Amino acid sequence: MEYKDVVMPEPLDDGKKKKKKEILNTRISPVDFENISDVGDLVESFQSASIQARNLGQCAKIFGTMLQDEEKPTIILGLAGPLIAAGLRKVIRDMVHYNMVDVIVSTGAILFQDYYNALGGGHYYGSPNADDTQLRELFINRIYDTYVDDELFVDDDTLVGKFADTLEPGNYSSRDFISRLSETIDDEESILVTARKNNVPVFCPAINDSSLGIGLTQHYYQARKAGRTPITIDSIRDNYELTQLVVQSTRTAAFYVAGGVPKNYINDSVVMAYIFGKDTGGHKYALQVTTDSPHWGGLSGSTLAEAQSWGKINKEATHSMAFIEPSVSLPLIYGYAFQKGLYKGRPRLDVEWEGDTLKKITRRRPA
């Protein structure tokens, strides 16, 4: 007997035929390089492919929709992972320069390594199989297959502390401190410098867990030793400031690169809106590129649908996740938006602070 005689002895009835036709509706389109001329075309073609290529294509499509939405949602970019070591400094800087993001929430390591590069430091080819004890003897730090100069790291830690020494004692948000720190460097390729020049707030909610925090700890120690009052980075002021941005925005959209503290912090700013008497309804758009998995239960890999149960992402939001390492996925999504020109004509967010109070948030057309 043939397979069909055993497994499919009876033909499908009309109802099942109709349902089958509904399900087998859209064909997968092969990636066709005869019709692909650039990264933008490649990523667009992924939208008709499968597996993580389709997820990446959907993330890129959502990012483009964010940029062109008539409501002009405030786009908050969350940054975690070894992005500078991976060679993405220029990509992130250009996302700011070309007005693809309005607010940044980052780990301290990313911001410090931008600062380190601005002061002449670099990242170098290495090997994950290196003799790490020898590297330690040479004061070379390893980030998987990439090396940095520990002597320069220590020098730059110290510079952060000495800069803090120049500030008036008091409470500073990470946004305020980072903006001031960026004034001490002059590098057009710097994320920090480009953000300051374009009035893009940069928050670092876990600043203590980084080389920036090491430098600030040195400042704290030296000030206490000398009987002076040190500055304090006020993490609750960070909450207060970021939540004002969320509350005063028409809508918000989130782009999470990896996960970690920045992802949850961006989401918690939506929850904290109730303190200001407002229910924002959650982010209108959300996308994430990550290698973390949902089934471990951790925040970094939790699905964006799960965030809807918390009200952090709108119940009708357009969202997608691509489980692809960010050193590959972020430049592809950026390249899609850049080469398609999806950022052009988008009014830049203009914010004005008075201490910890957001006095103005408007949009201005690009010159």
Question: At which residue positions do the language-model features occur?
Answer:
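N-terminal glycine-rich anion-binding loop in soluble enzyme alpha/beta folds
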Residues: 2-66
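C-terminal functional extensions of proteins
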Residues: 2-3, 7-9, 17-24, 251, ...
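Glycine-rich phosphate/diphosphate-binding loops that line cofactor/substrate pockets in enzymes
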Residues: 60-74, 194-196, 244-251
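Glycine-rich anion-binding loop/nest that anchors nucleotide
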Residues: 75-84, 104, 203-207, 227-299
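Short acidic, glycine/serine/threonine-rich loops at helix termini
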Residues: 87-90, 115-121, 214-218, 266-269, ...
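Short, solvent-exposed amphipathic alpha-helical segments in soluble enzyme
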Residues: 91-97, 218-221, 270-277, 302-306
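A generic, well-ordered mixed alpha/beta core segment in the N-terminal half of proteins
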Residues: 92-158
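Ligand-binding beta-strand-loop-alpha-helix segment within the catalytic cores
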Residues: 134-213
